A protein has these predicted regions:
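Catalytic core of pol beta-like nucleotidyltransferases
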Residues: 1-43, 55-61, 70-127
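Short helix-loop-helix/strand-helix junction enriched in hydrophobic and basic residues
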Residues: 46-53
Length: 127
């Protein structure tokens, strides 16, 4: 059969993370996900990208996690917004939105969201 070369990059290298985060943000804004969120959630207070796409360690099985803060006392709801048919170099990427109100969220989940990137609005982090 012959020899086959296997080439890969060091995915843990800082350069990959720093460039990939900026690339992921560009793909989020180009994909019109924010418009879909506004049609699904009325009057969001803040829209935050969190999880693997925020950290830059997403892979071919990762989904896009976006948190949406709303006013009120509603329990956390996770809605599958759909799949993005073409999202950068990937196809059929699932997008989930986590709708939460400040008064009814687990503190560990909120800490994860607070370390995300605010795409729109203002996320107030208070003790």
């Amino acid at each position: 059969l012959g020899k086959m070369w296997w080439i890969s990059c060091n995915q843990n290298h800082f350069y990959n993370y720093s460039r990939k985060i900026a690339y992921n943000l560009e793909m989020i804004y180009k994909s019109k996900v924010l418009e879909l969120i506004h049609s699904a959630v009325k009057s969001p207070r803040a829209i935050i990208l969190f999880g693997s796409y925020r950290k830059g360690d997403d892979n071919e099985r990762s989904d896009v996690d976006i948190a949406v803060e709303i006013l009120g006392d509603e329990e956390l709801r996770i809605i599958k917004l759909g799949t993005m048919p073409h999202f950068g170099y990937r196809y059929d990427v699932p997008v989930n939105i986590h709708i939460f109100s400040r008064n009814k969220i687990d503190l560990n989940l909120f800490a994860n969201i607070a370390n995300g990137i605010v795409l729109e609005g203002f996320l107030e982090v208070r003790p």
